[in-house]
């Protein structure tokens, strides 16, 4: 009855694929049927109605992961068509990625493009979800023989580097003029309070969120030792928040 995909693509969908493959195939077919009915995969569906809650393009990592683990019984080419539509359609006609235009043109989503009210701006969170989705799409494209797409989407997926600020040592929102937000406190957003750039979390809850390029992120931070030291500091200072999804994988990094 609910495809709360922002919540579930990170770990629950993999568990479902491993333990309940037949039911997972049924759910994926339902998702593809939703696309056939109205042109978009579900994002955060509730009782057969799309709510557009949260951000990203979560059907991509959800279904791509299942396919790469060997699940069949659904039309992967139809799913790929849906994924490519949301990853390439211009923003004014894109229900899944309404702020895709600067994401493609600049490699990131600036503050204020999607939400004029800075307290409700989730630009960094939006872009991070797009990077991960595009990486999953790149892997699927390669598996299906779409080599040019695989290269394109992998290049996009590395755009997270735009957000890394050496000054703060975290990912940091970027303003419309291409500068890092200032003043900036990476602890803003703790305990689900509003913070410019981040949805339901602080910069510390999102800074390590490049699971598709962990070694690349470590290089940005000055190497694997500094990466690990910074991660340890997050735990030591109580900046880790397992109550929400973006940083739940931190213990496994």
Please place each PLM-identified region on the residue numbering:
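Conserved kinase catalytic-core segment
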Residues: 13
């Amino acid at each position: 009855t609910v495809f709360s995909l922002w919540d579930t693509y990170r770990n629950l969908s993999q568990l479902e694929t491993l333990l309940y493959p037949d039911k997972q195939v049924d759910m994926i077919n339902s998702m593809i049927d939703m696309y056939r009915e109205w042109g978009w995969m579900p994002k955060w569906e509730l009782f057969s109605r799309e709510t557009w809650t949260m951000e990203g393009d979560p059907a991509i990592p959800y279904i791509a992961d299942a396919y790469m683990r060997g699940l069949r019984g659904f039309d992967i080419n139809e799913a790929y068509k849906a994924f490519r539509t949301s990853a390439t359609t211009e923003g004014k006609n894109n229900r899944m990625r309404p702020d895709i235009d600067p994401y493609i043109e600049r490699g990131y989503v600036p503050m204020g493009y999607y939400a004029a009210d800075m307290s409700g701006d989730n630009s960094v969170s939006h872009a991070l979800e797009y990077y991960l989705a595009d990486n999953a799409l790149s892997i699927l494209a390669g598996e299906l023989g779409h080599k040019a797409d695989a290269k394109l989407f992998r290049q996009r997926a590395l755009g997270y580097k735009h957000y890394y600020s050496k000054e703060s040592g975290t990912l940091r929102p970027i303003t419309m003029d291409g500068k890092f937000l200032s003043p900036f406190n990476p602890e803003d957003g703790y305990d689900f309070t509003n913070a410019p750039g981040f949805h339901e979390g602080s910069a510390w809850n999102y800074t390590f969120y490049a699971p598709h390029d962990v070694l690349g992120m470590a290089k940005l931070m000055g190497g694997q030792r500094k990466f690990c030291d910074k991660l340890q500091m997050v735990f030591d200072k109580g900046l880790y928040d397992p109550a929400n999804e973006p940083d739940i994988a931190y213990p496994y990094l």
